[in-house]
Amino acid sequence: SRIRLGKGRRIAQRLDADIIAGTYEGIDQVIRTKKSLGRVGTVVIDEVHMLEDAERGHRLAGMIARLRNAAPEAQFIFLSATVGNPGALAKQLNAALVEYEVRPVPIERHLIFSSGKEKRTLLRQLVAQAEKLTSSTGYRGQTIIFTNSRKNCYNLAQAIPGAAAYHAGLQYPERKRIEELFGQGKISTVVTTAALAAGVDFPASQVVFESLAMGINWLNVHEFNQMLGRAGRPGYHDLGLVYILAEPGRRFSSGRGESEDEVALALLG
């Protein structure tokens, strides 16, 4: 079978492949410009929980409607690992609900209450601890650290040996270089924002939340589950480890009213 993948933001001119893979925006642009997708038999939409995303949700909903209009006989398969209410979403999409509860690699979740200064010491300890572990398939432990700003990405990366800062503001060649080095095991730790949660595949054994905020707003359940789902990859790791470093009493004026420790307990509940 022929598979075509677009590179960057450029939309492939030939759409005669057996399988066409694209972003929501890329496929939607093809439909809007009246280009023919041919006879479509199956449409698979990954990360369908993005319907609830403030920025991309309306675009995804519109694309689904236009695809259904363009390919009325096609089978639609919607995938997500982090839908909060799958029954309601299935009803909204007029789809049959199929739930699969088994995770190939089990996850251990740990909550540690700590202050800002203590967090850095804990981060260094957790990273060093992960590096000492080797899975049954021979892969050394690696860590993804989530923080709430690009500035913190650099500050934390400088404070942790072997760490690299990764965020959406980096140029593509630099992002690609970090992805390849991490994939090869040459970088032990990536410090990132929520940018990594959306679509980048890093095989990490451990995920650490230095902050439970995205910018100045607390993470919601979907965002949190998407991020912690990075811990443990089939074929690489035997166990995924997740650590939440929550600062009691920490609040953001523009976020929800809860403190970080309260948010942590709610997300884990």
Region spans (language model):
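Inter-Walker segment of RecA-like/P-loop motor cores
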Residues: S1-V30
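Conserved helicase ATPase core of P-loop NTP-dependent helicases/translocases
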Residues: L5-A12, A164-T193
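Conserved interdomain linker/interface between the two RecA-like ATPase lobes of SF2 helicase motors
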Residues: A65, E73-A157, A246-E247
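Conserved segment of the helicase C-terminal RecA-like domain
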Residues: A74, F202, A213-L265
